[in-house]
Amino acid sequence: MSILNGPRLNFWGGIRTDVSLPNNSPTIPMGTGGSQTLNLFDLPNSQVAAEAASYSDDQLNELINAPNGDYYTAGGWNHYGQHVVDMQNVLISSQGTPGAISTTGDLVGQPVYLLGSKDPVTNQPPVSGPMMVDLDPTSGITTQIYIGGLQIGGTSNPQLVIQADVVASSFDVAKRLLVGETDAPGSSPLSGTFQVTFPLSAVVSWNQNSAMLKSIIQAPGATGIVVRFVMFEMCPGMTTPQLDADYAAGQYTPNPSIGRVVGTLAPAFAGEPLICPVGRQLVNGKTGGTGYAEVVALKGQNLLSLDMLNLIPKATFRAVRTDITSPIGPNIDYGPVSISAGGTTLVTLPSSNPYLLDYYLYGGILDQALNATQLTQVNGSPLSLSAPNTVAGTKLAVSEMTYRLYCDQRNLYMDEYPEGVTLDLQVRYLGGPVPAAGSITLAASSPGSYEDSEYWDLLDYPATFAIAKGQTSVQIPISCKAGTTAQAGYTNLEYSLEDGSSFSNFRIYSITDFGIPAGSVPTWDQVYPAVLRFHYLAFPAMSRFIPLNQQDAIWNARAAIVARTADAYRGTTLYMPVVRSMSPSQRALLKSYLTSTPWQP
């Protein structure tokens, strides 16, 4: 089962992501009207760029925070974020089984929270929330959210508590609104889909009197609990004038991105993807918005369950910038929506249908009954959605990608795989095995701003990989190229077959001695520029806990820093730094300094 074919809890509300922005670009504008550019950061190596090294920390902070005309500051719209993700008044809005979803029930109205990690060493409960991390900070397709659990219900009467360290990665980043917010990043019209699967063993407590929770947790054959949520209509809370005034007054207030979230919780089963939606893939040809479909056999009835949350766009951004908890409002009304298989219309839904009009109450999921003839058509033909009206120069034209490729290995840090990694790539045709032998094509490129090949051409992989008729998966070996240990960068590896494609991202850290002789005890003057200066400038919120530019403060906190940069914390929201920007060589150098032990690169 999954969010499409199992019992569901649907929820919606607001969400905030408090990320820090200066590391999103290696350069910043400077001079009158941004007429010049300064190479500020060497992001693959997490260091201040050579061109900026002679500037003082205060000078660089002033340049980062300088107004940048009508678009925030030279360093972007948030310099002081802690990377925390938190839900805002997210409530369960409907529950039930496919074909029988209701806006009333024992859990409707209960709040939903994502949690941070409990301490893996001391077992202390979470003290912070989930953390948003970009594998490549210059990219829009490498976002991750490190999560430590989930809770339904308030602290005084929790209905469900889950504790497990999982990572959600962004999928299906595409246009969700025809028009975004004007005073905002270019991502404001976009949406991103995130999914995690918690094992059943991670359930700490639950209300066993809840029939709905019982149907999920005790679903026959269930192995876990899956949560899929979509973030959209996101923009910084403050406008450009507000942020510039705040910085000018010396307040340096965090300016998180705020927006909408719609999601679904359901039982997970063996063989289903853990971090991406299950089912056949449909794509809106105009916006790139992606949906999923699956045939459900339930209580003697066949249903076509459609995740349509991203398939029909919304016309405009919300009217009130900071209002992220009021009703989201309808998508574009293209007229009656026809769902078809091949050339045959299965059903035409009026635009007043509640699953179209109030889609966010139902997780964006629609269940449509099928008769025997329709079931045969759906199983053997591509699906599509269409509607008659043209709105703002756009029409609704959604088609199924007959081939779908997907993988639970989305964002990988290659230092964790010194011998290489094998991608377990799932391949489907109309939801089933491939009908004929074929050849999967693989191609590497840059996922972000670092387009020179020295920063992304770092992997060994087969250019093509055969798949036989009847197969549903292949295992593809990936490793770092020989002779690249001194290089650092980011690689996007796309895999495609016929009309289907997807990708995985990789971060490769350099192995270096920083020019420090082996056997010597590192000094502050060596460690600060090699390890800490970049983090002090790019992530000043860290210094609100430990001032990263103060030798005494770092030394006094040495035990905590050594602990939190250790591998025991790596998969948690408590890892330092939370953005995973410190290479193994940097961590080793920092530890050598903090423990006064000879440097062994």
Feature map (PLM): residue ranges:
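Aromatic- and Gly/Pro-enriched helix-to-coil junctions and flexible linker segments
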Residues: 1-601
